[in-house]
Amino acid sequence: SGTDVYVGGGFTNVNNNGTSLTAADFVAKWNGSAWSALGSNGASNGSLGFSVYTIAISGTDVYVGGLFLNVNNGGTSLTAADYIAKWDGTNWSALGSDGAGNGSLNNSVFAIAISGTDVYVGGAFTNVNNNGTSLTAADFVAKWNGSAWSALGSNGASNGSLSTTVYAIAISGTDVYVGGNFTNVNNAGTSLPEADRIAKWDGTSWSALGSDGAGNGAISGVSVVNAIAVSGTDVYVGGSFSNGGSAPTADYIGKWNGSA
């Protein structure tokens, strides 16, 4: 963001030119010349308790997702900040809760993407508890609008559309591209077997990005999509796949132009 670079991972200390930053556990900022921590636990250690897997920025707000189960904001324990939290430049805060002081998500966050006030989150979670209301359709991907969580569609039977973990999210306009190791998307009761590892949510429905010509997904091999980036109508996809549909040489990275 500007000249600031935010970094997350499994590190437990940052050494800034000879000065140990013990509060820079798992997340830190580089301003072009020096490292700094994002807050502390009030006792010179970091605010986060475990690894950070993803970071997204909107204005001055930094959204962090990972495996941490708690955030300590200057000595105050935020038990609702499980797996995802927001840093506003001064303080940490949670994104909602389960209505009982715990976090809304029940497992790790691997991907965050932001569009306006909407924060899209993907990961290994199988449920989102929105202030006491269980969102059983919010499996592996969900949206936070600043005040409440919601699911992206369902399987038509109150469960989620995706079958397993989401590792990547990218947004273009109203389209949300989601990648992971899921092998099927169920769009309100309609199975989309060609939506293997990557799919698009247009705000109303899920759809596949092409196919192998036989009704299966375009991406094959020992497959997982780890990264997605969008430029205009082009969608770039990276992962461990060894084939990209009609492009057999598309190992590990491929481009979808909207039709091929």
Task: Map each language-model feature to its residues.
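Extracytoplasmic surface signature
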Residues: 1-260
